[in-house]
Design a protein with these regions (language model features):
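Short beta-strand/loop motif that positions the catalytic acidic residue
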Residues: 115, 121-123, 127
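Gly/Ala-rich beta-loop-alpha elbow adjacent to hydrolase catalytic centers
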Residues: 7-12, 16
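Catalytic active-site module of serine/aspartate enzymes centered on a nucleophile-bearing elbow/loop
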Residues: 145-178
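Short beta-strand immediately N-terminal to the catalytic nucleophile in serine-hydrolase-like folds
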Residues: 6-8, 31, 122
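Conserved alpha/beta-hydrolase catalytic His-Asp/Glu region
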Residues: 64-100
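Active-site nucleophile elbow and catalytic-triad environment of alpha/beta-hydrolase enzymes
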Residues: 91-116
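Flexible "cap/lid" loop of the alpha/beta hydrolase fold
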Residues: 24-59, 99-106
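Conserved alpha/beta-hydrolase "acid-adjacent" motif
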Residues: 128-137
């Protein structure tokens, strides 16, 4: 079978990076991905800049409930309806505490173990969780340029202008012959 093209968002971006340590891929798209250096810097930044959001997200990751406004603040820069937020919130589930620790410090991806395929690294100007500076750091780590979408937040694929990053991914796949 042909090697896959991986598209990973946030934690899924870390999964894609870990996959590359032991598997081949035809291409990888990292969208607002946890950086290869881990969550530590992003978590500290969020704790200092928006401590209420950080506290609520920790509760949510542990299976607790949070106000929809917290979800809106953490994920979106563009207007989003309460109905959409409620629908997405219902689909959320607790995260693995081990996975969070692994992404923070203990099991980070090692570039030396990877055979790097073509990579596209995307981020959002108003990302509260993985700021553009972290996305740019990820891109530099892999020797590519980050592409930051203005006026968008962490939930790139759910924002009102989701077609902009989706279109860029489609264009990139074509450029790579994928």
């Amino acid at each position: 079978p042909a090697a896959p093209v991986l598209v990973g968002h946030s934690m899924g971006g870390m999964v894609a990076q870990k996959y590359l340590e032991s598997h081949a891929a035809a291409g990888v798209v990292l969208m607002s991905s946890v950086p290869p250096q881990g969550l530590w810097a992003a978590a500290l930044g969020l704790a200092f800049q928006k401590p209420g959001v950080m506290s609520d997200l920790n509760s949510l990751l542990g299976g607790g409930r949070v106000a929809l406004d917290t979800l809106r603040s953490a994920m979106f820069a563009q207007p989003v309806t309460t109905e959409d937020l409620a629908r997405w919130y219902k689909r959320m589930q607790p995260e693995s505490h081990r996975a969070i620790w692994d992404m923070t410090l203990f099991n980070l991806p090692l570039k030396s173990r990877m055979t790097l395929p073509p990579l596209l690294v995307l981020g959002a100007e108003h990302d509260t969780l993985i700021p553009a500076s972290q996305v740019e750091m990820t891109a530099r780590h892999y020797g590519v340029e980050a592409e930051i979408f203005p006026g968008m937040g962490h939930g790139l694929m759910l924002e009102r202008d989701w077609e902009r990053p989706a279109g860029r991914i489609l264009d990139w796949l074509g450029e790579q012959g994928l």
